Amino acid sequence: MQESTMTERQALETAVLGGGCFWCTEAVFQQVQGVHSVVSGYAGGHLERPTYRAVCGGDTGHAEVVRVEFDPAVIPYREILDIFFATHDPTTLERQGNDIGPQYRSAVFAQSPEQFAEAGATIRALSAANVFDAPIVTEVVDASGGKVPFWQAEDEHQNYFRDHPAQGYCAFVISPKVAKFRERFAHRLQA
């Protein structure tokens, strides 16, 4: 059993994505088939061990992100990106809806050269297909080899939608986003 778990872990890949409030992005990816874990956190800033309060101040340079551990044999990175781009607005600079500030920017922190290339190709394809009414402003960052550290957010920010589905922000912002995801990507839902 332990050997099988080690082999399974070695086959997993990691994606780090910023699509606005991490509670929203976390809630979506927790429902995706082939995703093994989703952790809310921060990336892309200059402060070590940032806190939610510091990041929300807008001066640390960090984006709210999620670290998604997934099995590429079940869901390829390209489909992770498809879900990511379909469940937030990648055309708004430093904001998602009423959440405004650099911490809410759209960002892909590519964990390998292959992810970096795939993110660029995905953006070019979406742009060429005129999927969005405005240009995509998603930041694509080469974070391979630990160049850009991921900092896990405080415990109260983990599993937020699962733990607080009736909370106002969850009911009015996250729930509709999750419903849109579930409708569009029904074939990708966990059983």
Swiss-Prot record:
Matches recorded under InterPro entries: Met_Sox_Rdtase_MsrA_dom, Met_Sox_Rdtase_MsrA_sf
The residues responsible for catalysis, as annotated, are C21
Q: What is its EC number?
A: 1.8.4.11
Q: Does the keyword Oxidoreductase apply?
A: yes
Catalytic activity as recorded in UniProt: L-methionyl-[protein] + [thioredoxin]-disulfide + H2O = L-methionyl-(S)-S-oxide-[protein] + [thioredoxin]-dithiol; [thioredoxin]-disulfide + L-methionine + H2O = L-methionine (S)-S-oxide + [thioredoxin]-dithiol
EC class of the enzyme, as a word: oxidoreductase
Q: Which family does it belong to?
A: Belongs to the MsrA Met sulfoxide reductase family.
This molecule's function is given as:
Has an important function as a repair enzyme for proteins that have been inactivated by oxidation. Catalyzes the reversible oxidation-reduction of methionine sulfoxide in proteins to methionine.
Name of protein: Peptide methionine sulfoxide reductase MsrA
Q: Which organism is it from?
A: Ralstonia nicotianae (strain ATCC BAA-1114 / GMI1000) (Ralstonia solanacearum)
What are the top taxonomic ranks of the organism? Bacteria, Pseudomonadati, Pseudomonadota, Betaproteobacteria, Burkholderiales
State the encoding gene: msrA
